[in-house]
Amino acid sequence: EAAAANGSDHSAGLCRSQPVTQSTTVGLTIAYLVLFFAALLGNSIIIYVVQRHPKLRTTFNMLIVNMAASDILDVITAVPLSVAYLFVSVKWFPGGFGVFLCKLLPFLAYLSMGASVLTLTVMTIDRYFAIVRPMRRPLSKQLTMVAIILTWLISGAIFATELYKFRLFNDSGQVICAPRWVENIQDSHKITMFEKVIRFVLLYLVPLLTMAMFYSKIVLHLWKRKAPGVHIDKNQKRIEKQKRKVVTMLVTIVTLFAICWLPAHVNHFLLMFNLKVHSCLPHSLILTFYFLTHSNAAINPCLYLVFNESFREGFKHQVYNRLSRGNFNGSERLSTTRAEAFSATTSYNSLLSTKHGIRRDFGSAACRTML
């Protein structure tokens, strides 16, 4: 579509399309399989651990569970499409069920991406009020549920166009699944260019700038509290340390999200605005761009376990229970101290319990057309 939209004269200067090599196909297939099972297992563990332990069911962890759910949706929709593309390109199967999946799978893959970045934004704002403005009421569980539902509804509204534009075409006797807004290819390409820019701004640029602004304020606030001459008692030091670990985890997640999705956005813009340069990129490089975007789904649960002692301890106890075939007893429960330390950064009641101790300082992330 992009080549046709640029006209035959411009297309004459394009680099010749190179087929996917067998080594690239095998290598990426293995990588995608590892990614699929790692992301599915890791995010399922996060959801299970939170569900099993009442002390971990904080508003902040509800957002982490939402992130894990969106990552699972990403790998079960986008990974099969990406692997299929390695072997059959955009070929599809005919019939009503073929039309249904052609529209549904791209929509769900995009939906998960939008829900992830919006959830990250909500988590950032939640941490800002919990750390910088603790006297203001943070998100309640009811408001958190509303925020979670909104992340999916807003993402669904933004990407609802996938349900319209993806359709089946007959290309030289082969059925393919591809997006097209209108029958005229040039007009469809212009609409797609506008669409890519809007999505980049709404679901990449604006959220990242928003998160960068809030995290800058959080880091500045924590740095001031750590300055020499600022007296903090032992219990407050423990809570402050846990807050810093949570912020470090979130900043790492946001940074990796930005890094993982940037190459795909660059690829989209080259495809839309500079087809000549895009056509000269090695096919294996473009496919690697998209693998990088989905690898984010497997990295996130690792970060939760690395930075969060409560998650790690909950996971260890679950493994111990399975191996010993026993149920939790008093000695096997989560460490109350660690769980409360983490909850102190995410729970309104815990924030109120530290109110007097900080009174003097309280003002302060399948084919070129699909992905």
Give the positions of each predicted feature:
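Hydrophobic alpha-helical segments of membrane proteins
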Residues: L73-V83, A157-A160, Y164, L205, ...
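Extracellular TM2-ECL1-early TM3 structural module of rhodopsin-like
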Residues: T25-L33, T59-V122, R133-R137
